[in-house]
Amino acid sequence: MKKITLLLLGATCALSAGAQIRLGDGQLSGSFETNSIYYVDDAKMTDVAGYAVPEDRFGSNNYLKLDYNYGRFSAGIQMEAYMPMLLGFNEIPDAFHGFKLASKYVQWQDENFGILVGDIYDQFGNGLIFRSYEDRALGFNNSLEGVRGTYNFGNYVQFKGLYGRPRLYMDYEDSWIRGADLSVSLADIFGLRDAMFTLEGSYVNRFQKIDEEKSLHQGVSDQVRPNLNMYSGRLNLDWKGITARFEYVTKGEDDLFSVGAKGNVAKGNVYLAELGYSHKGFSVLGSFRRLEHMATLLSIYGEGTGNLINYIPALTRQYTYLLTNLNPYQVNPDGELGGQVDVYYSLRNKSARYKYWNLHANFSTYYTLKENTQNNKANLLWRDINVDVERQWNRSLKTSLLLS
C-alpha cells in the first residue's frame, strides 16, 4: 500500500491568554496557551520519506496554568492536554498524550528562608550538572517532584538543597535526584563595594536501582552503579567593566549512551572559562569550553531527548534571521574543545540618539577530542566567522548587512 506523506499544514492556530483576579488579600492569576494544527496532504511532494499522515489529522498541545499568591504563601497547578500531540513533537510515540495534572506546588518564602513542595524548576550554576526547566516549543519538561529548601544569610551566603524524582514526558521516573548549591559572596564579606566576587559550589546525585533484565535488554553496561555523583566549582568576578567566569565540573563513572559506545562507562568533566570587558559602546567576550562524557540522563532506562538532567548550550552566535539559523551547531556531549570570541561596538549620534551604527563580529570553532578519535587527532566539528553592520538612518528606516 502506497504511503501518503504529510507535508503541508492546512491550518495553524496559536493562542495565549492570561488574567489576574483579586481574592481578598490574595491574588489569583491564570494563563492558557494552545497550539493547534490541522494537517492536509501536499500531492506534489508525496515521495519525501519520513512524513506520514497521522491517524488523526488534528494535533493540539494545550496548557492551563493557575497560581495563587497570599503574602509569603503561594500555590499553583498546571494542566496539560494533548489531543493528540503535534506531529513531530517528540521522537517517542505517545510521549505526550491525554489530559493530566502535570505540575503542582505549594511554597512559603520569606526574606531569608523558603520551602517548596511539589514540582521544582531550578538550576545550579550554568546548568552543567543540573537544570530542571520547561520549554513548550520543544516539548521539554524535566521538573523534579519533591521538596526544595533555600536559606540566605544576608548577602553573604546563599544555600539551597532539593530532593525529588524527575519528570520524563507525562510520567515520573524511578530515579531520584538530590542536590545542594552554595554561593559565598567574598565581595560582601570583605566590603568590596566596587566589585562582585563569589565562590560557588554544587553537588548532584542520581540514584536508581539497577534492573539487570532491563540493562541487558537496553545494552546498559553492567559496570553502572546505582549512585552517580557530580560536583561543580565556580568563580565569578565583575569589576569596573571586567567580567570573569570559571567553572570546573567532574562527573563519576556513567554509561556512555552514544551510538557505538553504549555498554561502556567513563568519567566526565567540563572546563568552562569566560572573560569579557565592556566600556561605553564597546564590549568583547571570549568563551572557552572543554567537555567530555557529559550526557547525563534522568534515568538510565529512559529514552528520547527529554531524558536529560543537565543543560549544555551551544556557545556559538545565535542569529536573528531564519536563513542563518538553518544549520545551527549541535553540542557533542561525548567530547569537544573550542570556544568563541564576540566583539560589539555601537556608535551613536550625540545630537540624535536614535541614529546609530552597530558593528558586530563573531568567531566560533569546535573540535573533537583527540582521545576520542581513531586517528588520535582532533577533527573539526564547527567553524563560523561572521560580521554584521546595522545602521539606523532615522526613526523609520534601518538597514542591516550580514556576512557569514
What do the predicted segments below correspond to?
Residues 1-4:
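Positively charged n-region of N-terminal signal peptides that target proteins for export
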Residues 10-18:
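Hydrophobic h-region of N-terminal signal peptides that target proteins for export
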Residues 21-27, 33, 37-59, 69, ...:
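Signature for the C-terminal beta-barrel architecture of outer-membrane proteins
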Residues 62-66:
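Histidine-anchored nucleotide/phosphate-binding helix
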Residues 100-102:
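Extended catalytic core of nucleotide-activated donor transferases of GT-like folds
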Residues 120, 124, 133-134:
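Acidic, small-polar-rich N-terminal luminal/periplasmic segments of exported/outer-membrane proteins
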